[in-house]
Amino acid sequence: MVYNILIVKYGEIGVKGKNRYIFENRLIRNIRNMLKPIGRFNVYKEYGRIYVDLEDYDYEEVIEEVRKVFGIVGVCPGVRAKKDYDTLKEIALKMLEEKIEAGYKTFKVESRRGDKSFGLTSQEMSMDIGGYLLSKVGDRINVDVRNPEVKIKCEYREFHTMVYSDTIPGYGGLPLGTNGRAMSLLSGGIDSPVATWMVAKRGMEVEAVHFHSYPFTSERSQEKVKDLAKILAKYCGRVRLHKVNILEIQKAIGENCNEEEATILSRRFMMRIAQRLSEKRHCDALITGESIGQVASQTIQGLTCTNAVVDLPVFRPLIAMDKSDIVDIAKKIGTFETSIVPEEDCCSVFSPRKPVTKPRLEKIEKSETALDIEKLVQDVIDKIEVEDIEF
């Protein structure tokens, strides 16, 4: 089948009321941006839908990119043709014959009459086209109106006809750039890239901050995080990566504070630095990959202590998810194989033998009085390295 158009289906955007056009226009822009590496495409809105003209491009390659755009729940390859009812029926027959060759046994026709001057109603169109198809291939396939293996969808519009069948699922969500911007604390593990992706799926642009302890952690570990940011950029567009060396902070904690509190104290510094960066970059929230009880610092008491040093909302989309579910998403979005490459991070290098699991905020705050917090924070901020990551 020679497809010449994609029908883009969106979900939540359809119930946005008076603001719907804002989301639609952003979605169109995001689709165009996603397709730039392939070519220049005509992406437009018509009859309350979004379409992509395929021209001579490989439809499978284009669909694979379009389905990554947040806000899209499905993409349908279709054939758009001149406004002629007999032509519509011939295209429907050709499409059904391909489905028969692929092994399908039952079908149903669904029709939409966009041109009200046409002599048949939508239901009458379905019956007529279905009868025509049965007369041609009824010995090889049966009708099943309740649970068909194949749906042949036919539309008779004011200026053209259209036939399509398959729907390739998208990721849903809202168009990137419609819900502000967030700063993600991006490590090299499995969780934080998934958390970043999930928040971006709700329409937030994302930047990332990565904490390292070079030379105690290797340059390879930083390259690994860049690779993860590059994968995320496939979905999120450009990702600005802020690389922060907190070695001096960790040394100060080790010299002046209780060993068991080192992880919580380090996390509090990370949150402070992330908030400072967020204020500078006009980010509205922080993102972390934390999940209740997954590690010692992620108990409810630990999260309370880390939250206490920031004013921005902290989004933790993985908070109640099982590890297996997080891994499934990581595999789906393509970050898993990179995340499991063994490299030490700044937390594991200075991990205490017996970290405190139920820290008390007042005790942690008292421990911090031994540190010059403002100087330590400002010193590392002054040395931040910034890189824009694009796919």
UniProtKB/Swiss-Prot annotation:
Q: Which residues bind ATP?
A: L185, L186, H210, F211, R267, G289, Q298
EC number(s): the record gives: 2.8.1.4
* All copies of domain THUMP, residue ranges: 60-167
Alphabetically ordered keywords of this record: ATP-binding, Cytoplasm, Nucleotide-binding, RNA-binding, Thiamine biosynthesis, Transferase, tRNA-binding
Q: Which Gene3D superfamilies match?
A: 3.30.2130.30, HUPs
Q: Where are the transmembrane segments?
A: none
In which pathway does this enzyme or protein participate?
Cofactor biosynthesis; thiamine diphosphate biosynthesis
Q: Which residues form a coiled coil?
A: none
Q: Where in the sequence is the signal peptide annotated?
A: none
Family in the record = Belongs to the ThiI family.
Protein name stated in the entry: Probable tRNA sulfurtransferase
What organism is this sequence from?
Clostridioides difficile (strain 630)
